[in-house]
Amino acid sequence: MDRITELYHENFTKVLADWCKDHGVWYLGHNIEDNGAHARLGYGTGHYFRGQQEMDFAGIDVIGGQIVPGMNYHHDAFSTGGSNGEFYHYALAKLASSAAHLDPVKKGRAMCEAFGAYGWNEGLKTMKWIADHLMVRGINYLVPHAFNPKSFPDFDCPPHFYVHGHNPQFRYFKYFSDYVNRVMDIMKDGHYPAKIGLLYPAEMEWAGDYMPVEKPARVLTQSQIPFDIVTRDYLKQAEITDGKYKINQTEFEVLVVPYGEYMPEDLKEVIEKFCKT
């Protein structure tokens, strides 16, 4: 898995990124993160952060009722095996905002495609709740899904915000957009004061029994403790001095390590070095 995820970066994301740079355009998108796929193969890239390398924005997708008020636990859904509401509420947006903070290429830009396939009962009230949820977790670019040029009705992942005048809430969409744009514009130049790094446990998941990242993320979030999710790759490159480790421009004082049956030797060495300082 370690080599496979490196090869995915080298032969897919880097190739696309190089083309975009050569042609003067930004490169952005999202992986498939659903229900643990962010650290698995199949329909995932095997490692969220490696799958996002070289992109100018960190990206995620919130779709089909993944984030719903009160549904922050595992529950039945349209997807096989149900929906892991704990991951969607406490880890999904933090993956993107953490990558945006720690990868210098991204310059703090964290994007989310949102609102698709929630159905026609979603509405602007729910959309504002979802947008607020994402913004307080560090998302500062929103891609609304979707304005659909096809004739109404089209059954591809509604709601659609205009539908040639059939959506009665479209007249109010401007107020929602103005609000989100204003808040996100304020946030884009901010600095997130995280002192705690939460280890991304992909390598431990590949090797044996492990604790999913959303478990400690939930505890930290509900305790209102700011944190970023940090990876083995970032930790190996970190500057470690005076009891702190620095990744990009963020200085961390604490590293939270979820349970893992096995751990890569080089990761163990970095943690031991940090402990000794």
Language-model regions, residue ranges each:
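Carbohydrate-binding surfaces of carbohydrate-active enzymes
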Residues: 1-58, 62-277
